[in-house]
């Protein structure tokens, strides 16, 4: 019955644990699990173990390399896929520094007296992001963009004591799905606002109509949109409208583009959220990424912020010191009444972002943003030269992401490009007002003109040009 892969599977140990929790058998413990998918203890011995013999280190490494060789890598060209995370060049120094033993942990530095280096690095992250976004208070990280939106909605409800949040109908569906899950638990209704079909801008008339109902806790928008790339020119007017209605303005931003766009602090945002992935984190399945969360200087907002805050102070001997501050908001003190349930977090990713921002500086970050703008516009221009292709589909200004209409099903085109070794686009069929022929394409500073020309030529052949 004992199995080398299953801890505590020896009968004597199992019996002792079952007795301690007041359960008569393993079957009784798992009675809520459908029997068709349950592996009984009698079947444990049938689980295969490797090669039936111990393997040497060299053999194990060979097996792992064989498995890894089945993966497909997209480095030349990088993927033309964004939608909330983007292909970016990650300087080697970022990984070199965050893999140092002093930093390599995701755990919260509760013991300030032995964590000064880690805390200072997190304080620097907060300071750098505050400067980039022109927001006064930044926390030490949330999980990702989606969780940051969800936490912002919950925070808006606590501050305003209202339970409705408005979002544009073209809000990133992945962000919306997670945020709606957060909102449901907090008793918040999420309502979509119409977006202009030609420009991709939020419809101010529809927004005003919904705000007139008087129960809006917040309006959430993205600048630029992470699922259309559009830089909404109505963003300031929308923020003023929600403030006039007594709600908060939550703005989701892509951090690199803030080097050339007006930051949320100057757009009237009460809360700014986003993902730190473009700041030196690269792409890796679902993460780990970095939820950015910032607020303007307002006691009501700061006291209701989720997540850790690192502050600078002086110790008993007058020396500069760093510590976690305003901890009475947090679950290790307030338990169920805490402003969030995040403890162990993305601190290591925050340090990576701090390294990236420090390395590039304001001018370097601006150059990355300008290169992304240039390359995405070059790609849209080249694609528009193909017969039957409309690029960009929306008239609003864009950066990195842009929508394209093809003369064929976008999903089919994507599969055929993949067969040619290029991962390109997110089909938009079924999303908002887009058709099956519409696709979201992404081009950043990681792409070159050669990469774009390759994409255009391959797409031309896929379209039968």
Curated annotation (Swiss-Prot):
Keywords from the named record: Oxidoreductase
SUPFAM superfamilies cross-referenced by the UniProt entry: PLP-dependent transferases
Reaction(s) this enzyme catalyzes, per UniProt: N(6)-[(R)-lipoyl]-L-lysyl-[glycine-cleavage complex H protein] + glycine + H(+) = N(6)-[(R)-S(8)-aminomethyldihydrolipoyl]-L-lysyl-[glycine-cleavage complex H protein] + CO2
Superkingdom classification of source: Archaea
Pfam families on file: GDC-P
GO molecular function: glycine dehydrogenase (decarboxylating) activity
This enzyme's EC code(s): 1.4.4.2
GO BP, one annotated term: nucleoside metabolic process
InterPro entries found in the cross-reference section: GcvPA, GDC-P_N, GDC_P, PyrdxlP-dep_Trfase, PyrdxlP-dep_Trfase_major, PyrdxlP-dep_Trfase_small
Class of the enzyme per the UniProt entry, highest EC level: oxidoreductase
Keyword Signal: no
Function of the protein: The glycine cleavage system catalyzes the degradation of glycine. The P protein binds the alpha-amino group of glycine through its pyridoxal phosphate cofactor; CO(2) is released and the remaining methylamine moiety is then transferred to the lipoamide cofactor of the H protein.
Assembly notes: The glycine cleavage system is composed of four proteins: P, T, L and H. In this organism, the P 'protein' is a heterodimer of two subunits.
Family: Belongs to the GcvP family. N-terminal subunit subfamily.
Protein name according to UniProt: Probable glycine dehydrogenase (decarboxylating) subunit 1
Native species: Aeropyrum pernix (strain ATCC 700893 / DSM 11879 / JCM 9820 / NBRC 100138 / K1)
